[in-house]
Amino acid sequence: MAEITASLVKELRERTGAGMMECKKALVEANGDIELAIDNMRKSGQAKAAKKAGRVAAEGVIVARIANGFGVLVEMNCETDFVAKDAGFLGLANEVADFAAANKGTEIEALAAQFEEKRAALVAKIGENMTIRRVQYLDDARASYLHGAKIGVLVAGQGGDEELFKKVAMHVAASRPEYVNPTDVPADVVEHERNIQVDIAMQSGKPREIAEKMVEGRMRKFTGEVSLTGQPFVMDPSQSVGDFLKAAGATVSGFIRFEVGEGIEKVEEDFAAEVAKITGGNA
């Protein structure tokens, strides 16, 4: 049986909002598989739709550029928020973004190699590790949005103006859509959610035909919630983003959203334990 660690229980609690004992029991029954535990908890009514994995734990900045008909987002990481505000660190991050904007398609390995000497010199000067973590390009980018340099968004599309696409980019930053349109949600994702909703509906005790209608309604809601055009517009929740775009004669063809440290979990060591280790346990 897989080890059920405290950090695994903590993550399940954060993603489902369920109690500690319920989370531990679900993980034991799922043999430590957190995604299976979430599915089982949803089917049993212990949890609603879970938050996506990807706790933000690393520090750093997101830098955006739009040039020559395309956009680029770059993430550069460091260890502390203090260094994330350092002029030298910010200068290097912006230099990397400028290079990527001038050399479309440069992949992360080549980008890291290009700036390795400068990165190493800055590490030696500041005394803290830093990495150029990722880069992504978007054709037909119309607007970018940075939220405190911690979240970066690019939006591509046709019609409308820069102000319109800037508003859409702000929405993407706030609402975290995963797809552009409800029809873009992959078939396997739809099928996975449908299976969960069928189990939930059948447990209601209602006739099958009613249960099936319930599932169809919930699936429309699900695909709307995870897609940009199906979400309520953050600046005017009375209309969807799709309605907002349609009224302006505009369409979105794609977007990219970066958040500093997505998917990275920084190990937080207990301060007392660290002191004890340094002093040989004679604190």
From Swiss-Prot:
Keywords: Cytoplasm, Elongation factor, Protein biosynthesis. PROSITE patterns: EF_TS_1, EF_TS_2. It is found in: Cytoplasm. Pfam families: EF_TS. Residues 80-83 are annotated as: Involved in Mg(2+) ion dislocation from EF-Tu. Its main location: cytoplasm. One of its GO terms (cellular component) is cytoplasm. InterPro entries: EF-Ts_dimer_sf, Transl_elong_EFTs/EF1B, Transl_elong_EFTs/EF1B_dimer, Transl_elong_Ts_CS, UBA-like_sf. SUPFAM superfamilies: Elongation factor Ts (EF-Ts), dimerisation domain, UBA-like. GO terms for molecular function: translation elongation factor activity. CDD domains: UBA_EF-Ts. NCBIfam families: tsf. Belongs to the EF-Ts family. Associates with the EF-Tu.GDP complex and induces the exchange of GDP to GTP. It remains bound to the aminoacyl-tRNA.EF-Tu.GTP complex up to the GTP hydrolysis stage on the ribosome. This is Elongation factor Ts. The gene is tsf.
